[in-house]
């Protein structure tokens, strides 16, 4: 484990706090006037229990960064509420629940390459590619002449994800979607 200064904590980092592994959701610097000193306000989520907490850590304090072993895997298929991945190195299969994946399952198509992070041989998180290409299965038809405003319309993709798209995007077309924000990037 590596100790890092509180000022080096970044969103997405995994840190050990109170003998548990936490994922940093938000992190910002807070300066309290007078002799109060400076702090890092850190919002983090327990990766096992799913609980969230806010901690104020003095900037001069050090925290343990959790050792994470990344493994390249491929999403194979969905079986009920479980998603089956295959390790690219040893071809072992891993089943992860929909709850574990939270909102990430809406970006998964068969043969999508992902990085699964492990801590002490236990899966603790999935890192998706920066963007994915999905097919629109349902959206409102394009209204001719409705170009005066730059409005967006909802579109449902093949995975069930709802994305706001420009009016010119039609049902059956493929679009690129940002996996971090869920936003439309471009039509393919």
UniProtKB/Swiss-Prot annotation:
Compartments where found: Cytoplasm
Keywords: Cytoplasm, Elongation factor, Protein biosynthesis
A GO MF term: translation elongation factor activity
Domain of life: Bacteria
Cited function: Involved in peptide bond synthesis. Stimulates efficient translation and peptide-bond synthesis on native or reconstituted 70S ribosomes in vitro. Probably functions indirectly by altering the affinity of the ribosome for aminoacyl-tRNA, thus increasing their reactivity as acceptors for peptidyl transferase.
NCBIfam families found in the cross-reference section: efp, PRK00529.1
Protein's name in the database: Elongation factor P
Source organism per UniProt: Nitrosospira multiformis (strain ATCC 25196 / NCIMB 11849 / C 71)
